[in-house]
Amino acid sequence: MESADNGPLIGLLPHQWFNNASVAGKLGAAYDSVRGQIKLLAASQFKTQYRYQGFVPHWPGVKEGPRLDELADLLKADVRKRRELIPGRENNDNWRTSAYWQGKGLMRTTQLASVAEQQGDLEARDQLLGLAKERVEWWFSGQNRSYFHYDKGLGTLSGFPDEFFAVEQINDHHFHYGYWIRAAAEIALRDPAWAAKDKWGGMVDMLVADIATTRRGGSDFPFLRNFDPYEGHSWANGLGGVGEYGELGNNQESSSEAINAWAGLILWGEVSGNRELRDLGVYLYTTEIEAINHYWFDVHGQVFAPEYKHVEASMLFGGKYSHNTWWTDEPRQIKGINLLPIGTFATHLGRDPKYVLRNLGTLKGDTELWLSRGKSYSEVPKDTWHDVFAKYLALADPAAALSQWDRYGSVELGETRTHTLHWMLSLNEMGTPDFGVTADTPLYQVFKRAGGRKTYLAFNASKAPVGVRFSDGQVLTAAPGMLTRTRP
């Protein structure tokens, strides 16, 4: 028998069919999968459309409040110890000298520089930016034991020394290089000449191209190395899944570090005048956030099987989801690896405040269960990543986060106490993110206090004033090369 050709059936994943008006009323049969229900669409193509929420490179200075002296004291202390912010360039054991740890150090250094700048300490800002430039140039020069190497045969840029099989298996490049791209963009905001293509910007462009070139069919780098357009998120293993886990397909653990990378593309594209790259970054950033909400956090309750009792998946494989990490089963790190780094680009984590509280609410029980199995905090502090969780809570309840935070608590190696306190004080002053308002510029954010008062932010990377219109009717003129705030 031969049937008529009625065209293909496309299987849509939850992030493709959920709230997708273009396929409403057109979906047919569905079947269960590890990603939730796959629904069939009789068509040769379909589209997804998500709302880009925006972010700004940094938040304005905090000028009022009871803890300004504490913020100033922490800033002085962190600046005084600035040489400790980035791990040493070289040591006999290669301890934390890889591109990953160096990148985390660079990003926290430039974040601290932004806080210093916004709080009015330009001398501290310049000291920190000078330190960041020094380390970037050390690696980019190719004249030292720490360097990047382009392998023409493999079509990849690798950092030496490496960790996490970043060279052997081409793992985690978007995680590692995202920190570098973001830090370089922060430097470029203040020193465009440093970031020129014939200076250090050319190397930044290579880092970008390695993880997400906009060119198809190139002989140097593959198009979108890490990102899977159909799955809507990135994969971290460069070989597509190997060893004992190979049958489960590829995997990704730290979805939040992927978001950091795509935010870096947006910012670098905007600062360098590369609109094509900026727009690609917007697509990657916005799409992966939707996938994270479905497959890592299951905020809509459509993915996790009933027997899966955790509130999040910390590791996503092609064929399973898992509540663990590659290096530990300690609950705080299991939860935190999909939160860090928390910067201005990460406010999407607070889109569902009830989920934030529910997520954090499971930490106590998870920890008690872990300890009951004979585990102990012999290798890490009991308050590991205390600052990460405080910043996450602040997206839902800034006052509670500020009251619970201990300035003497542990510090994650991509953070500083100054940046953490500035984050919480900012949210206490401005309110939580208002995701109902958009703007006609890529670098913007809106916050809303409980009483209804809003704060509008816009960053203008160009050399001329730009008029910005927000979807609720508010307008402002963004001054060139800086952050502009209005609070009607």
Region annotations inferred by a language model:
Residues 200-207, 278, 282-289, 474:
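Active/binding-pocket-proximal capping segment
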Residues 96-116, 128, 167-208, 254-262:
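Aromatic-rich carbohydrate-recognition surfaces in CAZymes
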Residues 247-252:
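Active-site rim elements
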Residues 192-194, 217, 275:
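Surface-exposed helix-capping loop/turn segments at secondary-structure junctions
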Residues 255-288:
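Active-site neighborhood of glycoside hydrolase catalytic domains
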Residues 211:
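Charged, terminal alpha-helix-loop-beta segments
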